[in-house]
Amino acid sequence: MKELGLKKNLSQFILLVIVNAFVGGMVGIERTIIPQFASENFNLSSKSAILTFIVAFGITKALTNFAFGKLANSFGRKNLLIIGWIFAIPIPIILINANLWGWVIFANILLGINQGLTWSSTVNMKIDLVGEKDRGFAMGLNEFSGYLAVGVTAYLSGFLANKYGVTPYPFYLGFLIALIGLILTVFFVKETEPFVKIESKTDDSKSIENIFIETTFKNKTLSSVTQAGLINNLNDGMIWGLLPILLFSMNLDNEQIGIIAAAYPTFWGIGQLFTGKMSDFYSKKKMLFWGM
């Protein structure tokens, strides 16, 4: 008999925390080395041209996140997590062998699908396991593991690029991350949909007919939360795209860029350890206000 709760499902919960660290690791690979990669391999120096890979990633991830809810109900969370990892496998191979910038953009479209499916899967699966009581804590641990891994791999990719060159060794790390994530998911992660059915028996809340319209325009509270999330992700995109370009133009080496690029997601992740649990008993509106 399956039961909701963190203690009752601790082993699966910890496993999903580990899996999400690998999810974060995939996106962290590009946080440091792209300016030099673009300059050396494609003779790109234009900021607007270089940043096209982030635009491709962001749009694809947004669309994948939007579709995730219905896809999860149809195919199951674990299956989507597996599919997300399958999309990750060719990314490092494409980047190693890319001879046109278009291939880099294509690789980041795949990365957007990967992140949309895997990150959404892991956070929802954790929430499924713990139930209503510890949702904030589950979310906090998910973000902690993911963003801490972004920081770690941002530094590691810079270190590898500085020691062995911008390609291929940093991307070998990406391939290893994707492979381990896929193996862990296929053989050890369990589907959490049965836990959703358990919680739905005691949940009398009404379903929303058009979630996009309701959360973006109609419901003022949800609309403001959505806008805050948009601003937060825009900030992240600017740090990801512009900071390494600025540091590269200042003639810092990749390891130095990696240290600076790693600081932001690392401290973001560490902060989630505290703010996640806070949201279970403290006003989320006040937390959002002070955060903004």
Please provide the spans of the model-predicted regions.
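Structural signature of the two symmetry-related core transmembrane helices
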Residues: N79-I93, K286-M292
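Cytoplasmic helix-loop-helix junction between adjacent transmembrane helices
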Residues: I109-Y147
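Symmetry-related core transmembrane helices of the 12-TM Major Facilitator Superfamily/SLC fold
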Residues: Y169-F187
